[in-house]
Amino acid sequence: SRGNSMTNAHGVHILADYTGFFPKLDNTGEWILSLMEKVVDESTANRVHSHIEEFDGTSSPPGFAAVVLLDESHLTAHCYSEKGWLSIDCFTCGSTNPGAIIDAMHSAIQEASPGIKLEKRKTEARFTNG
């Protein structure tokens, strides 16, 4: 159907879910945010703002949520550190390829946490309304 066709889409959204994310890093959240910024800066996307929230387990499970806002949309990462769950997603409009951004994130994450497993990667056409 037309709604699933990338050729009619004005945006592309890629989601990746991982398990086994247990990197041996002192500050995993800050490392991920720095990686996100680096990957975006090496792409054709335009970084507008970056932010991370670290969760210490007091009011929610330990982990972090990180976002890099793009002129074209966003790149996010969310982690439940005790469970080793990591979810990243990239949504872009225009000519920026979110697949290249996700691929670069995947390579670096795999290097930092060799036991990581990609459980799901899904690509969705967005703004398919003509």
Label each residue range with its predicted role:
Residues 2-130:
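Polybasic/polar functional segments that serve as interface/processing modules
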